[in-house]
Amino acid sequence: SIVSQFLLCKKTKEKVTVALGGDGGDEIFAGYDTFKAIRFAKIIENLLPRAIHPAITKIIGIVPRSLSYMNFRFKLQRLLMGIGHKEALRQPLWLSPVGKNEVEELFESQVNLEDLFSEAIIEWEKCNEKNPIDKSLQFYGNIFLQNQILTKVDRTSMMHGLEVRS
């Protein structure tokens, strides 16, 4: 997304010197599907024993593939990826572009998820909210919004002398 942001800022600077950006809304107003997943994960964990989660994952493999963005099968697979793990691991797992198996295949070795996501776990544990959704909002604000999204917008806009307000 940094390339598209760069090009957008370049084109915008041709007409204005200050622009209003739209980044950050999902992180502030719980717009991501991961916030819905928190509720579904709790329901699944309360209703279905952990022992049958692998079977559910295999059943999801039967769901037809789709090329559409964030399709039903993808959402189900992501949801199940976080279930059974402590809350501190769920958001990093759901946000990760690849799963544990893909990382292990890439590095040809076993991966400990707590080691892989240690920085995210530390940030999660710093959050003082008790409710999982509120804690996730705080987590997104502290790690994702501050260190990634807004930094990307700031740097790409400043490269073109464009002031972007979020």
What do these predicted ranges mean?
Residues 1-116, 152-166:
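ATP-dependent adenylate-handling active sites, centered on carboxylate activation for C-N bond formation
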Residues 145:
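Phosphate/pyrophosphate-binding loops and the adjoining catalytic core of nucleotide-dependent enzymes
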